[in-house]
């Protein structure tokens, strides 16, 4: 693997594709806690992290499974779930006394309307001070799940079998996908009342 005497082996986490150290250094030099937003296919994780020489210290954390405990019946990896997770994190952070942070997306790119940016919008709506641009955040129709509702209505008319397969978890949990925006508002009110 080495290419001569001057070859320098990259850091292990860089080789594994886990950490962008140039970006991490810029974030750490701000001396502000980071809002770490991560999304997998089925879950959302949001954390407020402070730098420590020994290792980063997680101050507050929220997981999309926590909104399920509050009664959320939808999919935990979509934009509405990301917003609710960010809102929950923001409420927890404010209770702990953390009012400001900067967004850390890791190796994710900041694509307009992405679910990781819905986490940011949720935290900002909870009352946190996080620098951002309004135009990159997802629209209100995507945050409350109206796009899911429209697709479900279209699919129910065109192909009932595909509708039942696509939204099987919603139906199993007792939620019609057409009712997602109302259900979203109900869970949002629960989180805001915490």
UniProtKB/Swiss-Prot annotation:
Record's GO cellular component, any one? cytosolic large ribosomal subunit
Q: Which SUPFAM superfamilies match?
A: Translational machinery components (SSF53137)
Q: Does the keyword rRNA-binding apply?
A: yes
Keyword flag Translocase: no
**Which domain of life does the UniProt lineage start with?**
Archaea
Q: Which InterPro entries match?
A: Rbsml_uL18_euk (IPR005485)
Q: Name one GO biological process term.
A: translation
Any one GO molecular function term: 5S rRNA binding
Q: What Gene3D superfamilies does UniProt report for this protein, alphabetically?
A: 3.30.420.100
The alphabetical list of record keywords is: Ribonucleoprotein, Ribosomal protein, RNA-binding, rRNA-binding
Provide the function of this protein.
This is one of the proteins that bind and probably mediate the attachment of the 5S RNA into the large ribosomal subunit, where it forms part of the central protuberance.
Family membership, please give it: Belongs to the universal ribosomal protein uL18 family.
Q: How does it assemble?
A: Part of the 50S ribosomal subunit. Contacts the 5S and 23S rRNAs.
- Which NCBIfam families does this entry report, sorted A to Z? PRK08569.1
This protein's name: Large ribosomal subunit protein uL18
Q: Which taxonomic lineage is given here?
A: Archaea, Methanobacteriati, Methanobacteriota, Methanomada group, Methanococci
């Amino acid at each position: 693997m080495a290419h001569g005497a001057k070859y320098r082996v990259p850091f292990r986490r860089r080789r594994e594709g886990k950490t962008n150290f140039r970006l991490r250094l810029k974030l750490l030099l701000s001396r502000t806690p980071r809002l770490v937003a991560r999304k997998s296919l089925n879950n959302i994780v949001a954390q407020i992290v402070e730098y420590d020489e020994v290792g980063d210290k997680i101050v507050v954390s929220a997981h999309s499974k926590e909104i399920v405990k509050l009664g959320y019946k939808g999919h935990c990896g979509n934009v509405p779930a990301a917003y609710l997770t960010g809102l929950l994190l923001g409420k927890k952070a404010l209770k702990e006394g953390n009012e400001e942070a900067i967004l850390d997306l890791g190796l994710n790119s900041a694509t307009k309307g992405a679910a990781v940016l819905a986490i940011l919008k949720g935290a900002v709506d909870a009352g946190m001070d996080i620098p951002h641009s309004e135009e990159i955040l997802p629209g209100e129709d995507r945050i409350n799940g109206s796009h899911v509702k429209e697709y479900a209505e279209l699919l129910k008319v065109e192909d009932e079998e595909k509708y039942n397969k696509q939204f099987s978890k919603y139906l199993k949990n007792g939620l019609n996908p057409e009712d997602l925006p109302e259900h979203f508002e109900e869970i949002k009110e629960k989180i805001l009342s915490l």
